[in-house]
Amino acid sequence: MRKKERYEKILAWFRENRPVAETELHYETPFQLLIAVILSAQCTDKRVNMIVPPLYRDFPTPEVLAASTPEVIYEYIRSVSYPNNKAKHLVGMAQMLVKDFNSEVPDTLEELVKLPGVGRKTANVIQSVVFNKAAMAVDTHVFRVSHRLGLVSDACTTRVSYTHLRAHE
C-alpha cells in the first residue's frame, strides 16, 4: 500500500471513529484547558487532574491568575514536573491574556504560541479541542506511531512530521 493510501485509510478511520477531538484533562473553560495543557508537558494527565481543582477554584479567571505570583502558583503545582518554570509561564500567560487578548484564549496558532509556556503542541491541542479546528498535536508518541506506520521517515523531527501529516488531511 502506498503512503498516500495509508494516510487516507488512517484519516478515514479517525473521521469515523473519533470525529471530535477529546482530552483526558479535566476542564470547564478554554482558560482552564490552557492551564491544564501547559501543566501536562512532561507530566501525566492523571497528575495534572489531581492538582488542578484548587488551582481552578482559586484562580478562575485570567485576571485573578495574572494578579498572582509564580511563588504562590508554585505551591499549587509543586507536584508536576518543572513547577518553577510552569508557575512563571502560567502567570505570564494570564498577564498576556489580560493585556493583549481581552482575557480570552486566542484561537489562532500564531497568537497562541506567543503566550508563555505555549508551544505548537499546546496550541494545536487548544485549537482542536476548544475551537474544533483541524489541528494535530504531534508529540513523541504521534511521531513514533507515524514512523511505524510508514507515514514519516526516520530523519523527520516532530515539527517536520506535523507538516507531513497535515499535508495529507
Predicted regions and their residues:
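Catalytic cores of DNA base-excision repair glycosylases
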Residues: 2-166
